[in-house]
């Protein structure tokens, strides 16, 4: 497995801050102590079946479930692009305290509407001084501007990233999308980064990364033209539009099927209840986007 290959051969313990049902923890032997946190209680319960494990159900960005412990090995595949309650919006003082701690000395917090770099900050907060971490991340975290650009600059200045690989066909449920695999350490004097795209790789010095505004997109540094495959001209913005269209298409099909089932089985809850639930989700996200802290301008895309 690509992620396991980036970690030391001998691992005594491993931590996954967003462990789901424990899929990544299961790649380690029964002799390895496994620690995890998962926000979905049902998924956390499945993960508890893993031998030699300690799993908590909860929000890893709101509480340190393993206080005073730092891990030599961390592996993670956090959800991409989800909102989070950073300290300025967190009414619970204890939860706000942990969110502040993971961003201690950072120039700013991750934006409220995207927790990608908050997960990175948490991973580094829990990583031991000589530890190694590997994490899958959506490609947007590598190039988005404003607050995230400032955080990337801070991380590159600390020598956090040793390797960034473009995984062009990562499997997620029923779809295959490109993601980035980040190999990280607590800090290092070596600020260069090895960028990898399939068989092509290139080590890039700090000065060049700085010239590019701390954009860490693999295709910016690796000669993607040598990669003769369908992804060589990958456009992340067009891809996002395609995903949104697919979500709408799948939702339409699901609603149509649900309407048919309601006609067949009158014991099912009325379709209107389902539609009301969907509308509530839409209204929630419209409200969050309209708040001043989440306003997006043209500058956000630069």
Enumerate the language-model features and the residues they cover.
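Conserved S-adenosyl-L-methionine
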Residues: 1-76, 81-83, 130, 138-140, ...
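A conserved structural/catalytic subdomain of Rossmann-like adenosyl-cofactor enzymes
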Residues: 68, 72-302
């Amino acid at each position: 497995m690509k992620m396991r290959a980036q970690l030391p051969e001998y691992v005594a313990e491993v931590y996954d801050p967003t462990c789901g049902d424990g899929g990544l923890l299961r790649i380690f032997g029964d002799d390895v102590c496994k620690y995890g946190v998962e926000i979905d209680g049902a998924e956390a319960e499945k993960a508890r079946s893993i031998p030699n494990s300690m799993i908590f159900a909860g929000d890893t960005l709101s509480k340190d479930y393993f206080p005073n412990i730092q891990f030599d090995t961390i592996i993670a595949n956090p959800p991409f692009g989800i909102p989070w309650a950073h300290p300025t919006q967190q009414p619970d003082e204890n939860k706000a305290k942990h969110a502040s701690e993971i961003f201690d000395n950072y120039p700013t917090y991750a934006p409220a509407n995207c927790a990608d770099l908050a997960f990175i900050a948490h991973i580094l907060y829990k990583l031991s001084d000589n530890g190694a971490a590997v994490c899958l991340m959506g490609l947007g975290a590598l190039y988005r501007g404003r607050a995230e650009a400032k955080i990337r600059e801070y991380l590159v200045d600390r020598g956090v990233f040793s390797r960034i690989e473009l995984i062009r066909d990562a499997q997620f449920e029923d779809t295959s999308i490109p993601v980035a695999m980040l190999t990280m350490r607590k800090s290092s004097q070596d600020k260069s980064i090895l960028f990898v795209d399939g068989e092509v790789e290139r080590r890039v010095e700090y000065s060049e990364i700085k010239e590019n505004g701390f954009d860490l997109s693999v295709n910016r540094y690796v000669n993607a033209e040598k990669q003769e495959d369908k992804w060589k001209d990958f456009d992340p913005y067009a891809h996002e539009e395609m995903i949104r269209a697919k979500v709408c298409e799948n939702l339409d099909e699901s609603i149509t099927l649900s309407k048919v089932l309601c006609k067949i089985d009158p014991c099912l809850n009325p379709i209107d209840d389902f539609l009301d639930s969907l509308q509530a989700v839409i209204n929630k996200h419209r409200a969050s986007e309209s708040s001043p802290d989440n306003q997006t301008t043209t500058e956000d895309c630069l």
